[in-house]
Swiss-Prot record:
It holds the Pfam family Ank_2. GO terms for molecular function: RNA binding; RNA nuclease activity. The keyword Repeat applies. ANK repeats lie at residues 49-77, 81-110, 114-145. Keywords: ANK repeat, Repeat. This is Putative ankyrin repeat protein RBE_0151. InterPro entries: Ankyrin_rpt, Ankyrin_rpt-contain_sf. PROSITE patterns: ANK_REP_REGION, ANK_REPEAT. GO terms for biological process: RNA processing.
Length: 162
């Protein structure tokens, strides 16, 4: 009998070498915020991306909603692509939410799956206000995983004014 992905999945208890195929689920409760977003975004997408209420609120760019769902226990949780709420706020070009997340424990220093810290991402996006805020108010890794400095990054992405 040939073992395919399907049979290996169903037989994971009997095939220890295929235990890595077991799906990893994270339980996310159905809060009022989550129900609201499920009316806008298909629930399958929310679940597959592993978005929390905070990720959704940051994506919606609503500071009051971010403040209401934010707590220090979930502020640095990553989604399926390894992005924190702070990184999503930087990608969304929203300084007010970036400031709120940093003041409430959003971590800038850990690198994402590409080896960039949040300040590298801000340089790539090109928002001078966010870069300045992160530079003055946070601790960060000056070099990415390839050894490039912040200045190298600015030149590489064409944002020399940073």
């Amino acid at each position: 009998m040939e073992i395919t992905m399907t049979t290996a999945y169903y037989r994971h208890k009997y095939c220890p070498d295929t235990s890595y195929l077991r799906p990893k689920y994270i339980y996310i409760p159905k809060t009022p915020v989550r129900k609201f977003f499920e009316s806008l975004i298909p629930p399958q997408i929310i679940d597959s991306e592993k978005w929390t209420d905070l990720h959704l609120a940051v994506g919606y760019k609503n500071i009051k909603l971010v403040q209401s769902v934010c707590n220090k226990h979930n502020i640095n949780i990553k989604d399926a692509k390894g992005r924190t709420a702070l990184e999503l706020a930087i990608l969304g070009d929203n300084l007010e939410i970036v400031q709120f997340l940093v003041q409430n424990g959003g971590v800038v220093a850990p690198n994402n799956m590409y080896g960039w810290s949040a300040i590298h991402l801000a340089i790539k996006v090109g928002n001078l206000d966010i870069v300045k805020y992160l530079y003055e108010n946070t601790k960060f890794n000056e070099h990415d995983k390839y050894g490039l400095t912040l200045q190298n990054w600015a030149e590489k992405v064409g944002n020399e004014q940073i």
